[in-house]
Structure formats: structure tokens, C-alpha cells
Amino acid sequence: MERLAKRLDACQEQLLELYEENSRDLQKHIEHWKCLRMEAVVLYKAREMGFANIGHQIVPTLETCRAKAHMAIEIHLALETLLQSSYGKEPWTLQETSNELWLTNPKKCFKKQGRTVEVIFDGKQDNAMHYTAWTYIYIQTVQGTWCKVQGHVCHAGLYYIVENMKQFYCNFKEEAKKYGVTDQWEVHDGNQVIVSPAPISSTTSTDAEIPSTGSTKLVQQVCTTNPLHTTTSIDNHHADCTDGTAYNVPIQTSPPRKRYRQCGQSPSQHLQHSNPSIPSIPSASVDPGLCGVRTNSENCNKRRNHCGSQATPVIHLQGDPNCLKCLRFRLKRNCSHLFTQVSSTWHLTENDCTRDTKTGIITIHYYDEAQRNLFLNTVKIPSGIKSCIGYMSMLQFI
């Protein structure tokens, strides 16, 4: 009994010294786990001999002592092999070598520089969960060697790539089954928002299918006030967007001036879908493997003249009223600097004053085409919502 008490006191005294030192040397953390390993062995032996306590120290059950000893041995051996690798010279903290982080997903590997990723389910702000994404993950291969990989975030979940294979340690689809109803979610990683991949369609009859691989370019003609040509390109440019579309929320800048439309034209002549003589944007089904990034360099509309009356660029979005309401809420919260106004949900009625209550329309107003192009470059239109760009002249009275 006395010998066990002396050994336990020696282990705990050394542990206190290591805690006070708070070293960033991996060798010190190996000594720390060696002491914990010895402490678990002493307590296990004391319980095996029938002692309920050693001095003022209560001896846990055999199962608890055995589990602590196994954990200490496992981490101690892992740290010793890590010390022999090229990462042994890196600074390490007690927290980064703790058993809590060792058992945190991804389990049984070391992790550094964690950050919080927020996932909002069903488009409801009060239905959000937080997950930890790791910047660097240290994986031990089957051969026993250590490799350092970077952690990634996509719409599908949190993952890292080792030996050209994606390894997910958090699957958002499984989380959506637990916390959501509609199987829809969006990921907020810092100032980056990743939404579910979905096709974008317009009210025109022309369809353009975009391939799912490679870098593709979709050329479109857009009506503007300058006799130029518009080119819209959609590229696979980000590895993390293979399971979703990411966009960054840009810094707010001062709005540009309004522009003027041709005299004598009615508002309906400025809506692309109602004027067959004006080229329209073909709808494009965006493959989940593509990240939509539009860059406008030219545009064409030689039929428009310059005149004193104002024409405000707009985008009409048509779809389920609830989806439009959620989209309007997200736009006001994250992208309010990318447009001037957004309407409430409105409907088109037939001659008999009936209307289709299953679909609604919202109209987004912009200062000019430049701000509208910035909006298109930044915001991903959700699934099931049709879009149509145009101009409205009555906004000068608002």
C-alpha cells in the first residue's frame, strides 16, 4: 500500500509540473502521457488488490482503470511515432494532444486549427447546428507513417483527402435527416455560403445543358444600354464545390449611378421574355459539380437608344411562395448591398381574376446593369425558382 501511494504521488507531482510548464514541445507531451499511463496502472493494481482508496485518492473500478490505461497507452505510442516523423518538430499544445481531441471526429488522429461551421437546415435560422472543421489533420497510414492533410468543407460535409480518396468525417445529409424535414441545408463557413446544387431555369424556351466536367463557357446575349456583347462563363474553379455551390459575400461598396432607357418604350418592352426581338438568356441546368461564377465582359443591344427617362434593371424570380420568402430573407441578410429593393411576393391573374396560388413572383431592383451583374456573379438561385431579367420604367415614381 505504501509503495503504491509513493508511486502515485510521484506521478501526480510530475503531472502538475508539466501542467504548470505548459510546454509546446512534443517530447513534454509524451512525458505527460507516460505519467498518465503509469497512474492508470497504479490505480488498476490498487483496485485489483482490493483497495478502495489510496490516501485521499479514490480508486476507480477495474473497468474504468483499464479503459484509462488503454487510452493512455494508445495516445502515448501514437505520440512517440509522431515525434519520429517530420511533424515532431512542430509546436504542439496539451490541448492538441489531449484524449478529447483524439476522440473528436475524425477520430484517432491529431488535429489543429479548428473553426466553427454553421449549417442551417430547412432555411430556418433557429434550426442551425455548429460543427468543427479542422484546417490541418495528421493521419497515420497503414504503413505506420504520418501524413499531414488539409481539411475541406463542401455542401456534402467535412472531409479530407488522403491517397487521392475523400474521407468524410461529418456527413451533412445524415445530419439533415436528424435535424431537418425538407432535406435541404446551407453551409456557412466564415464569409462563404455553400448552398445545395440545383439547376437554374428562366422563362425562355431555349435550354442549354452544361457538361458536368471540365471548364465550360456559356455565351449569352443580354439587353443593356451599351452596344457591346456579353459573355457569361461558368467554370469549375474550386475543389470544395463538387457537392455544392459556394459564393463569397463581398464588401459593401457605394452604389453606381442610375442609367436611362430609350424614350417612348413601355415597361413590357424591357422585359426579355415578352419581346421576341430582344435576345434572351437561355436557361442552363447547372451540374452539381460546377461552381457558377459569371464574368461579364461585353453585352449587346443595338436597338436601345439613350434618352432622358429612367429604366431600372430588375430580375423577376418565380417559384414556390415559401421558397421565395426564404430566399428574400437570405438576400436581405447576406446580400442587401447587391440590390436596391426587393418586392413582396406577387401573382399574375387570369382574365377571370383567378390566380395560381402555387407559384409567386418577387422582383429585385438594381441601380444599374453593373450592380445586377455583380448580383448574378455572387448569388446562386435555388432549385425550382425561375429567373428572368428585364427593365421597369415605373420605378422612377417610387
Curated annotation (Swiss-Prot):
SUPFAM superfamilies: E2 regulatory, transactivation domain (SSF51332), Viral DNA-binding domain (SSF54957). Residues 311-398 are annotated as: DNA-binding domain. One of its GO terms (cellular component) is host cell nucleus. The keyword Cell membrane does not apply. One of its GO terms (molecular function) is DNA-binding transcription factor activity. Residues 1-201 are annotated as: Transactivation domain. Residues 256-280 are annotated as: Disordered. Pfam families: PPV_E2_C, PPV_E2_N. GO terms for biological process: DNA replication; DNA-templated transcription; regulation of DNA replication; viral DNA genome replication. Residues 263-275 have a biased composition (Polar residues). Phosphorylated. Its main location: host cell. Belongs to the papillomaviridae E2 protein family. Binds DNA as homodimer. Interacts with protein E1; this interaction greatly increases E1 DNA-binding activity. Interacts with protein L1; this interaction enhances E2-dependent replication and transcription activation. Interacts with protein L2; this interaction inhibits E2 transcriptional activity but not DNA replication function E2. Interacts with protein E7; this interaction inhibits E7 oncogenic activity. Interacts with host TAF1; this interaction modulates E2-dependent transcriptional regulation. Interacts with host BRD4; this interaction mediates E2 transcriptional activation function. Plays a role in the initiation of viral DNA replication. A dimer of E2 interacts with a dimer of E1 in order to improve specificity of E1 DNA binding activity. Once the complex recognizes and binds DNA at specific sites, the E2 dimer is removed from DNA. E2 also regulates viral transcription through binding to the E2RE response element (5'-ACCNNNNNNGGT-3') present in multiple copies in the regulatory regions of the viral genome. Activates or represses transcription depending on E2RE's position with regards to proximal promoter elements including the TATA-box. This is Regulatory protein E2. It comes from Human papillomavirus 42. The lineage of its organism: Viruses, Monodnaviria, Shotokuvirae, Cossaviricota, Papovaviricetes.
